[in-house]
Every structure is written in structure tokens, then in C-alpha cells.
């Protein structure tokens, strides 16, 4: 107990330095634990399903003229069922699901619910390994107009009432009967529906292509009875598929299975961000730990005498070591309290930055992450200084202790300076790229444009809806289409004159005024005005190798043979993650297509709210909702925004931590060299000379460290930039500027801390010796 008493007294006596330790450790622990927890959380995706190691997802690989396309998790509808029928000795069950046919909201009375839903067959729950709480899905999901609700959605819709037998509405068009409930799924799974609608509900209305011939828009899964070599499994699956798909010399398809757990963590962007977050987490933890070591060891000269007193009183090496470990433990505990305070007081921001709820990040099965990070900090941050302190000889009680060797301090400072340059450089590049893609001209004008779904059931209702929207005083213009650019559009294969598939092109059906409404540019010809006419973009022309002679040519599409009457200037499709894509613009003959486009007058936000209210009153029996196109575009870069926030927080934390370590180093140097400085001044050295000497001492460490850190930022920033088709340009000037700013901050910190002693009377320093 005496050890703890002396430790507490030492902490109180040095409370100024200890507050700095607590704050720097608290910030470092917060950032590193959040980063490591996020990495582990992402690696745990899809482990919530029962016996997840037996659950596999099916993937498509299309081949055009022998050239394979990247694997796609959206596959042809009949594949899963066909594999189950052909391989009953291996496959226990199979399921087909689709979210696009049931993307509209469901209603309980007049209350709208936009929760994620899928349509699925009767073996969905058995295949996925999801616990069914009530109902018989194998029997009920074979019927049309049936829905199963997750427990949390059922509670939200009906409170404590039994939902079985309740009638709800899909899109105010189809009445669905609730036939069962199932356990809610955690956030970390790729298939997490809040409601499951029976697949016959879709089939009976002839929605979608559910066959062996195209229609690759379904997510499908199989559950195995027994372990089997993955290569052998995929070989047998491919044999089944080849027996059923239509024969084609030009177009081929391969279906393969992958463990469901590899789906999320196999995405390129997830693997890229995992590596970057690991680097950031390790950097911050390493720098935080070494900063604590640096601050602790820098207090050696101040604390040597008290340790000598303890040893004179009978304390051995182990006792002194134990006292320092107790001190480290208490400081880390206080830092953890600060971390918890920060996380819960800034919970919304933290959850937005990590893209996960705190209770998910720190679930019981992942609590080892913060414990492990804390243990690493305690062992390195406690053992290294503790051993140095415990070896101080008892003779230090009789004389002033000055540690003349700087070998152990310089590497610590080097690592911290390199870490600051690395994280600040990466942060600046991420911020520049985010600003660039958000503000770059996409080739059309989304300003004040809103998009809503047209649910008018017939031509008369469509015409009435058009007149209603055009008559609103705050609507500037109206047009219509079946999709929108940032959504990526659907695709179709474009063949040559011999029927050989050349490439996949995006396409849309729009009204005649669509191009002018969107601010797109016609390079040649005009817009389509009737069926059988199309306009193509410049990239389409390049893919066809037509040169400038384009107008009047015809191409084969899924709509038949069509004539090209115009060429549109290239515009961005599917965000700046993708290269330019070929595009075909068809004419839509009806008054309104699937989507209604409106350009509103200012004030935009106020008029959008008026539009939602007026449309809901005008069409009470339809699902009506409008969203800003600019907001949809911004949402597509949400992961970039989140990473920008994370790097900004990391940069602020690491800059504060490093400056605290630098201040500790400077204080120790000033105390160690105070007599030398005084003698130099007595011998005629000016204040500027003293400052120059101390600044050069730090620059010998900081300059190569900042160069190394900047090179690291350049490498990691390059990895992160790989996800974009367009980038901000040459980043070298920005990296150089960041390096210079970091060096200026370091030099400014040195000058501010040494200014007083460089200008004080040297007699005071000599007297204190």
C-alpha cells in the first residue's frame, strides 16, 4: 500500500506533466482503438449466420469473346435452384433473393416504412441460417403476397401486438399478409433484410427475368451438407450451369461459389481500407506509446533524486520498477476514462466516422481489441521507462543527475515526426480529393434537381400527374427518365454487324427535353424524338471506332435495330470511381417514365418540403417521395467523407501528441544544457545563436523524419487513390507543402519553448547549478 501512496503523491506533485500524459494517451487510445476495432469488425462480417462456414454465395463471371468480366454477385435467377436439384448429395439447400423488385416502401395503414427488404424463395431462412421465431417459411413463402418481418421491424410496426395475420401494403399497391417473424440480424452482415416477401409475389406479376437466359440481378446462396474442396465444388457447379445456359460462341457465363464470409472482406475497397486503417492504427498506437516513453524518460533528471531517496529508504530495483508500473497503470486508467467520455459525448460523430454503432464495435466478442491495445501500451510504455528508472543509482540523492546521452531520445522523436508528416500528408490528400470529386463538373447540371418515382398506374393518371407537377408555382422545369447518371444505369451488350458482342453499354429511356433539362451537350445531330432513334455518347463512338461519321448509323440493341441521330458529350456515370462508360439514350414515348425529374426554384430546401407535402396530398393512394440529385451524388462519396473525417481526427490527435513529446524533450534539453547555454552567453553568444543551435539540433532529427513520413504518405495515398478514375492531379506540390508546414510547426514549437532561456540572464542559470 505504501507503494501506491508514494505513486499517488508523485502523480499529484507532477500533475502538470501527468495531465499532458493523460490527454495525449486518451487521444491516442481513442483513435487507435477505434481504428483497430473497425478493422476487426469488418473482418467479422457474415459470421452471424448459423454454421456460416457451410454457407456460400454464388458469383457470375461473364465472358465476351473470350475476355472475362470481373466477378459479380448478381447472377442469373435459376442458378441456385438448378445447382440444388443437380447436386443434392452436396448441397443441403439453396436460395434466391432480390432487393430491386421490392425497393418501394411498405405501409401499415398510413404509416410508411422504408426498411430494407428482399424477395426470396421458401428455402431462404433454412439456407441462410437465420432463426425463425414464428411461422413456417418453407410452406408460407411458396404462396404469393406473403411477408415475414424481422422482430425489430414487427415491434416497430405493431408495438407489442402479435403481427401474425396482419395485412400491410406494399407501395400502396399490393396487400401482404404477415405470416411469420425472424430474429433481427446484426449490422455486420451483407444480407440483412428487415422483411422478406415471397418470390411468387413477384413471379405472379411477371416482374424480372428469373431464368437461365440473362436476368443477372439476383443474389443467390447455397448451404453445403459436408465440406468439399472449393475448386472441386466450383468445377461441379460450372458443369451444371453449362448444361442449362443457352449456347453461344461469343458470350459465356461461369458461376462459382465463395464462402459467404469472404464476400464483404473480399471487396477491393474493403481490403484497401483495411490495410490503410491498420497502418494508421499501428502508427498512432506506436507514436502514442513512444511519446509516453519520451515524456517519462525526459523527466529522469527531475525525478532521479526522489528515486535515490526511495533506494536509501530500502527500496530495491523491483520496488521502484513496480512503482512506475503502478503509475503507468493509473495514468492509462485515467486515459481510458477520457476515451470513454469522448466516445459517448461525441457518439454521433464517432459512429458516423467509423460507420458502425459503438455497441457493435465493442461487442463482447470484440472486447479483446481495446484490451489488447491497452495491454500493448501498458507493457511498452511502462516496462521501458520503468527499467531505466529502477536502475538509477542511490548516489543520485547526493548530486544533481544529468543524463548526457541522447541516443534513446532521438529515435523516439524521429518516429513521432515521421508519423506526423505521414498522417498530415495523407489527411491533406484525402481532403483535396474529396473536395475535387464533390465539386468536379460531372457533365450535367444537378443544381436544384429532385427525382421522384412515378407510380401512376395508367396513361390518364400519368398525364394528370404531369399537369399537376407542371402547375406547381415553385417548379421551374420537368422531364422524365427511367434512371439517373449517378445510379450507374442498367447495361446491355452491343454487337457488331455479325452479332459478335463488342462491349457492355449503359442505357436510359428519356423524354425529348431531358438532355436540355440536364444541361448535357449535343456534339452532333439532335436528341431522339421517336422510338427507334437513339443518341450515343463520345465514349460509345470511340469504342465502335467510327471516327466522325456517326449520324445515320444503326446498332442492334435489346429494343431492336435503332438509328443514331445524335452524339452527346461525355458525362460522368456512376460517380468518379468509374472510367468513362459508353451510353445509349433512347426516346421514351409516354408522358412520364419511371422517374420524375423536377428543377425547383429557390429557396430550394423550402420548396422541396412543399413539393413533398403537396404531392402526398394530391396522390394519397400512391407512394410519393422526392430526393435531391445533388444529395444522391454526395451520398455516393460518403465513404470518402468518412475517411476524410477519420484522417482529420487522426492528424489532430497525432499532432497534439507529438508536440507534447517535443515539449518534454525540449524541457529536458534545456535543463540538461542550461549551464552550457549560460557559459556560451557569458562568452558573447547572442540569443539568435543560442536559438539557432537548439533549432539545428531538432532539425537534424525532424528533417529526415518528415521526408520519410511524407514518402510514406505518398505511397499510402497512392493506394487510396486507386479507387478513383479521376484524381486531383499531381500531388507532389501538396506533399512538399505539408512537409514544410510540419517543419515550420516543429521549429516554431522549439523557438517558443527556448525563447525565454535564450534571452535570460546567464547568471541565473549558473547560480542554479
Q: What do the PLM-derived regions correspond to, one by one?
A:
Residues 34, 242-243, 254, 328-391, ...:
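Small-residue-rich transmembrane alpha-helices
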Residues 268-347, 352, 368:
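Hydrophobic alpha-helical bundles that form the membrane domains of multi-pass transporters
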Amino acid at each position: 500500500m505504501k507503494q501506491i501512496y508514494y505513486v499517488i503523491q508523485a502523480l499529484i506533485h507532477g500533475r502538470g506533466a501527468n495531465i499532458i500524459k493523460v490527454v495525449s494517451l486518451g487521444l491516442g487510445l481513442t483513435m487507435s482503438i477505434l481504428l483497430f476495432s473497425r478493422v476487426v469488425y469488418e473482418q467479422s462480417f457474415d459470421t452471424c449466420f448459423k454454421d456460416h462456414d457451410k454457407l456460400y454465395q454464388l458469383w457470375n463471371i461473364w465472358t465476351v469473346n473470350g475476355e472475362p468480366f470481373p466477378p459479380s454477385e448478381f447472377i442469373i435467377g435459376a442458378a441456385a435452384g438448378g445447382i440444388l436439384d443437380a447436386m443434392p448429395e452436396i448441397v443441403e439447400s439453396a436460395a434466391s433473393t432480390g432487393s430491386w423488385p421490392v425497393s418501394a416502401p411498405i405501409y401499415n395503414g398510413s404509416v410508411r416504412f422504408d426498411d430494407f427488404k428482399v424477395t426470396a424463395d421458401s428455402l431462404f431462412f433454412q439456407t441462410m441460417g437465420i432463426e425463425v421465431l414464428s411461422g413456417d417459411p418453407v410452406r408460407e413463402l411458396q404462396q404469393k403476397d406473403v411477408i415475414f418481418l424481422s422482430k425489430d421491424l414487427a415491434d416497430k410496426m405493431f408495438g407489442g401486438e402479435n403481427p401474425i395475420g396482419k395485412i400491410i401494403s406494399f407501395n400502396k399497391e399490393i396487400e401482404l399478409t404477415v405470416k411469420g417473424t425472424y430474429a433481427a440480424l446484426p449490422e455486420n452482415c451483407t444480407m440483412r433484410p428487415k422483411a422478406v416477401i415471397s418470390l411468387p409475389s413477384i413471379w405472379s406479376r411477371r416482374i424480372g427475368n428469373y431464368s437461365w437466359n440473362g436476368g443477372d440481378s439476383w443474389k443467390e446462396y447455397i448451404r453445403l451438407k459436408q465440406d468439399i474442396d472449393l475448386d472441386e465444388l466450383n468445377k461441379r457447379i460450372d458443369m451444371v450451369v453449362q448444361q442449362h445456359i443457352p449456347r453461344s460462341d461469343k458470350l459465356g457465363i461461369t458461376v462459382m461459389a465463395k464462402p459467404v464470409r469472404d464476400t464483404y472482406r473480399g471487396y477491393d475497397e474493403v481490403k484497401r481500407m483495411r490495410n490503410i486503417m491498420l497502418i494508421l492504427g499501428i502508427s498512432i498506437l506506436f507514436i502514442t506509446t513512444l511519446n509516453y516513453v519520451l515524456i517519462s524518460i525526459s523527466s529522469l533528471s527531475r525525478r532521479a533524486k526522489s528515486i535515490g531517496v526511495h533506494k536509501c529508504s530500502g527500496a530495491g530495483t523491483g520496488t521502484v520498477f513496480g512503482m512506475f508500473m503502478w503509475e503507468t497503470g493509473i495514468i492509462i486508467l485515467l486515459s481510458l476514462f477520457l476515451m470513454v467520455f469522448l466516445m459517448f459525448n461525441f457518439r454521433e460523430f464517432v459512429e458516423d466516422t467509423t460507420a458502425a454503432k459503438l455497441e457493435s464495435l465493442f461487442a463482447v466478442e470484440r472486447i479483446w481489441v481495446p484490451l489488447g491495445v491497452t495491454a500493448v501500451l501498458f507493457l511498452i510504455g511502462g516496462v521501458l521507462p520503468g527499467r531505466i528508472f529502477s536502475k538509477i543509482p542511490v548516489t543520485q540523492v547526493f548530486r544533481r543527475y544529468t543524463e548526457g546521452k541522447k541516443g534513446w531520445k532521438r529515435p523516439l522523436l524521429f518516429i513521432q515526426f515521421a508519423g506526423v508528416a505521414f498522417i498530415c500528408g495523407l489527411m491533406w490528400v484525402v481532403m483535396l480529393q474529396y473536395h475535387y470529386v464533390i465539386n468536379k463538373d460531372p457533365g450535367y447540371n444537378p443544381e436544384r434537381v429532385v427525382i421522384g418515382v412515378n407510380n401512376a398506374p395508367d396513361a390518364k393518371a400519368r398525364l394528370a400527374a404531369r399537369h399537376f407537377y407542371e402547375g406547381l408555382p415553385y417548379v421551374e422545369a420537368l422531364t422524365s427518365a427511367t434512371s439517373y447518371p449517378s445510379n450507374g444505369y442498367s447495361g446491355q451488350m452491343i454487337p457488331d454487324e455479325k452479332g459478335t458482342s463488342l462491349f457492355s453499354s449503359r442505357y436510359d429511356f428519356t423524354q425529348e427535353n431531358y438532355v436540355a433539362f440536364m444541361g448535357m451537350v449535343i456534339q452532333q445531330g439532335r436528341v431522339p424524338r421517336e422510338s427507334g432513334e437513339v443518341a450515343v455518347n463520345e465514349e460509345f463512338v470511340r469504342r465502335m471506332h467510327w471516327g466522325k461519321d456517326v449520324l445515320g448509323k444503326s446498332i442492334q440493341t435489346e429494343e431492336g435495330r435503332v438509328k443514331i441521330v445524335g452524339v452527346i458529350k461525355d458525362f460522368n456515370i456512376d460517380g468518379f470511381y468509374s472510367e468513362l462508360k459508353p451510353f445509349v439514350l433512347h426516346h421514351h414515348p409516354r408522358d412520364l417514365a419511371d422517374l420524375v425529374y423536377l428543377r425547383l426554384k429557390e429557396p430550394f430546401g423550402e420548396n422541396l418540403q412543399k413539393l413533398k407535402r403537396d404531392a402526398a396530398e394530391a396522390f394519397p393512394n400512391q407512394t410519393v417521395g422526392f430526393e435531391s440529385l445533388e444529395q444522391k451524388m454526395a451520398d455516393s462519396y460518403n465513404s470518402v467523407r468518412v475517411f476524410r473525417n477519420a484522417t482529420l481526427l487522426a492528424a489532430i490527435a497525432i499532432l497534439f501528441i507529438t508536440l507534447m513529446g517535443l515539449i518534454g524533450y525540449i524541457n529536458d534539453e534545456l535543463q540538461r544544457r542550461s549551464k552550457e547555454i549560460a557559459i556560451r552567453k557569458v562568452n558573447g553568444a547572442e540569443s539568435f545563436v543560442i536559438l539557432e543551435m537548439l533549432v539545428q539540433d531538432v532539425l537534424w532529427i525532424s528533417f529526415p523524419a518528415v521526408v520519410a513520413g511524407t514518402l510514406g504518405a505518398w505511397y499510402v495515398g497512392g493506394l487510396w487513390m486507386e479507387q478513383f478514375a479521376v484524381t486531383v492531379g499531381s500531388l507532389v506540390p501538396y506533399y512538399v507543402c505539408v512537409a514544410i508546414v510540419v517543419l515550420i510547426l516543429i521549429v516554431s514549437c522549439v523557438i517558443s519553448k527556448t525563447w525565454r532561456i535564450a534571452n535570460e540572464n546567464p547568471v541565473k542559470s549558473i547560480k542554479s547549478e
